[in-house]
């Protein structure tokens, strides 16, 4: 059972997004991008009040994922990536992205000593 409704097309979109955003980070990095994407669909706060589907999350502009602007995102979906996407759509969570709405690529920017930690989520309800 999935934690959000999705179509086959949306599962493929999420799989392509996960690959385009984090293939160089390996399977775990891709799964965490998937967590961020699913969390954005579930969240009803901040920049994500109008995001109600995988498709609207993937193509959100402004404030969405940059990889949709590049040709690599538009390559055909691979079965391995689709299987990873289905895992997060079914509710698998991967720390520290289990409740994250954004992620940070430390390889491209100066890395903060800690970029996650205790946060109050009183305004945000996500399934556990």
Residues of each region from the PLM?
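Short, surface-exposed, charged loop/turn segments at secondary-structure junctions
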Residues: 32-35, 116-121
């Amino acid at each position: 059972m999935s934690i959000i409704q999705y179509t086959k097309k949306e599962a493929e979109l999420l799989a392509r997004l996960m690959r385009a955003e984090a293939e160089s980070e390996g399977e775990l990095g891709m799964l965490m991008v998937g967590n961020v994407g699913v969390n954005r669909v579930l969240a009803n706060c901040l920049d994500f009040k109008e995001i109600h589907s995988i498709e609207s999350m993937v193509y959100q502009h402004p404030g969405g994922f940059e990889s949709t602007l590049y040709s690599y995102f538009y390559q055909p979906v691979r079965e391995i990536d689709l299987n990873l996407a289905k895992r997060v759509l079914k509710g698998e969570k991967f720390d520290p992205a289990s409740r994250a709405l954004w992620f940070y690529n430390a390889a491209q920017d100066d890395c903060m000593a800690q970029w996650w930690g205790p946060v109050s989520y009183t305004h945000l309800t996500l399934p556990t």
